[in-house]
């Protein structure tokens, strides 16, 4: 069973429907005791980094997530959920994240180095470029996936970047270290490529994808 962490800021419906399509049992909950029963966790997220961390800290879910990861429970952060895995964000003023991966979250400049303006948020389909092998990407093609975001991660350690995309700058699109994974894009809205990544994560969490 996969636990989708409900803290009031996730794209819960589309993630839960994607798991249903994969035939994967899940629980959608903000209750720590319920989530403790899950073999893997998904942290979705849409909205403000500062608001999300405030809720996670106030509800005790931030401490729960850190403890679960320390105990080896796989975790997948999606979109804002991926950004929350890192040390801090500059959105609405400096805010500490979960600190599970080193790095900080910054806003797209909106202007290229040559002075050309471009649209922020980044919204649309971009191709993945793989950098490192991972069980999360096993059998996945370097296809196009769907992004909606105004901020991106500058990693403290490039080794956590499993795949990137390009939108004026190099955007870490898939990250991972140990049992912690993240996608900046929405795998549940990214067609066959996204569903393959979600299916691999379910395999990692349930023990059929660790080989």
Swiss-Prot record:
The active site is at 79 (nucleophile), 186, 188. It is found in: Cytoplasm. It comes from the Bacteria. Coiled coil: none annotated. Residues 1-211 form the Glutamine amidotransferase type-1 domain. It catalyses: 5-[(5-phospho-1-deoxy-D-ribulos-1-ylimino)methylamino]-1-(5-phospho-beta-D-ribosyl)imidazole-4-carboxamide + L-glutamine = D-erythro-1-(imidazol-4-yl)glycerol 3-phosphate + 5-amino-1-(5-phospho-beta-D-ribosyl)imidazole-4-carboxamide + L-glutamate + H(+); L-glutamine + H2O = L-glutamate + NH4(+). NCBIfam families: IMP_synth_hisH (TIGR01855). This is Imidazole glycerol phosphate synthase subunit HisH. The gene is hisH.
């Amino acid at each position: 069973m996969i636990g989708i962490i409900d803290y009031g800021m996730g794209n819960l419906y589309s993630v839960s429907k994607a798991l249903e399509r994969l035939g994967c049992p899940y629980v959608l909950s903000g209750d720590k005791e319920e989530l403790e029963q899950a073999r893997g966790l998904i942290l979705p997220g849409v909205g403000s980094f500062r608001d999300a961390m405030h809720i996670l800290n106030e509800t005790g879910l931030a401490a729960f997530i850190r403890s679960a990861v320390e105990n080896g429970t796989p975790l997948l952060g999606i979109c804002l959920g991926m950004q929350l895995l890192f040390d801090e964000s500059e959105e609405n003023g400096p805010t500490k994240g979960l600190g599970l991966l080193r790095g900080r979250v910054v806003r797209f400049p909106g202007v290229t180095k040559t002075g050309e303006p471009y649209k922020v948020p980044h919204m649309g389909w971009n191709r993945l470029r793989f950098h490192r092998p991972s069980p999360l990407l096993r059998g996945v093609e370097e296809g196009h996936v769907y992004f909606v975001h105004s901020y991106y991660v500058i990693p403290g350690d490039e080794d956590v970047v499993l795949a990137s995309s390009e939108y004026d700058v190099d955007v870490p699109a898939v990250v991972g270290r140990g049992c912690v994974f993240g996608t900046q894009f929405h795998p549940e809205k990214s067609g066959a490529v996204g569903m393959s990544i979600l299916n691999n994560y379910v395999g990692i969490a349930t023990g059929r994808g660790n080989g």
